[in-house]
Amino acid sequence: FVMKKIVITMLVLLSAAYAVGIGGGEVARKLNLRPSQIVPAADTLPVRNLIYLIGDGMGLSHVSMLMLEEGYGTTAFDRAQNIALITTYSANNRVTDSAAAGTALATRHKTGNGMLGVLPDSTAAESIMADAIRAGMPTGVVVTSTLQHATPGAFYAHVPYRRQYQRISDQLAGSDLTVAFGGGLKYAEASEREDGVPGIERLRDRGFRVLTDPSQLDTLSRGPVMGFFADGHLPKMSEGRGDYLERATRKALEILSREAGERDRGFILMVEGSQIDLRAHDNDAEGVLAEMRDFDRAVAAAMDFADRHPGTLVVVTADHETGGLSIPSADVDFEHEEAGIEYRFSTGGHTAAMVPVYLYGTGSERINGVLDNTELARMLKWLVLPDSGRIANVPD
């Protein structure tokens, strides 16, 4: 407990030092307050674009694994300009699932495990994507799971149970996302609607281009477009998925940036490293590392975009930690030369551990300290959509 308090205190002090160093004095002075009480520095650029990267199941140990294996200072995570920690509990369980956590990150509201895009009473909870669409902003999602899975679904769907994949898919086909890349073709080719019209046909009727092969990404220049690149989830990295996530992220950014410019608006893109979680459920350390390396390349693509486009905020976080991953020494005698390290999992499920938030780009100094996942979501809405209400009172 004492060590935990020391670590948290160090994180807060580092965040304060960074905020003062870049001129975000107002943030530093109020750092001991809840994020809902923080006012932005007047000399900071407004946040126009949000790139929201979610490593499903990614805890601090998963990031540490990447850094240890890649060499400190070489990963996209090392480029972070600010950091925070978030709690992940759901409305009915201290250990969340991806549906409840995704709903919190997308909508600013807690819900029960298994519930997606709805409040505990099953009332629809509007996501930041829906808010952005109403404001005329292009939006998109890029994942390595099915597009109907919990995290992406939280940004556009409303169902009482996360495994209602066909119902979620039917809602996807009726959504106003500008770009969506992932798996889930088998659901897009079917329907539970009374008219029986498959989602793919509905999308085409609505003017969407529909892709089924990742090689078609190179042919794109604008949306609306949805790509369903596998019947279910895309393959594991070990099974040849290649650089799909990075390529799809870069293509989505290209399309959204162009359309945002034409509309004189910003954009929001959510990118998920979906299969970090799946490999951690399997307690597959090599698989986790491969998925983390893949996600790291997508994070780097987002940061590179932010470097070229002032007004872009990159937020990298997780919905929860999976596997209870620890990294002990292979030798308990630390006074001798290192004998190596080990990667050990304590569970095949999720844990209640806090997860990290890495921030980069415009507005990165405004979020720091220890907060809840819903508070992070409220801050992001306020930064990207300031006309939606004061951060101290955002009830919607």
Give the residues covered by each predicted segment.
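Active-site His/acidic residue clusters
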Residues: 150-155, 232-240, 257-266, 270-298
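Metal-dependent active-site segment of extracytoplasmic phospho-/sulfohydrolases and closely related
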Residues: 60, 293-334
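N-terminal catalytic scaffold of extracellular/periplasmic and nuclease hydrolases
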Residues: 21-217, 223, 321-396
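Positively charged n-region of N-terminal signal peptides that target proteins for export
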Residues: 3-6
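Functional beta-strand-loop-alpha-helix junction segments that form "active/interaction loops"
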Residues: 119, 210-249
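Active-site regions of oxyanion-processing enzymes, predominantly non-cytosolic
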Residues: 213, 217-228, 250-274
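Structural motif
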Residues: 52, 180, 227-229, 268-272, ...
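Hydrophobic membrane-insertion alpha-helices, especially the h-region
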Residues: 9-21
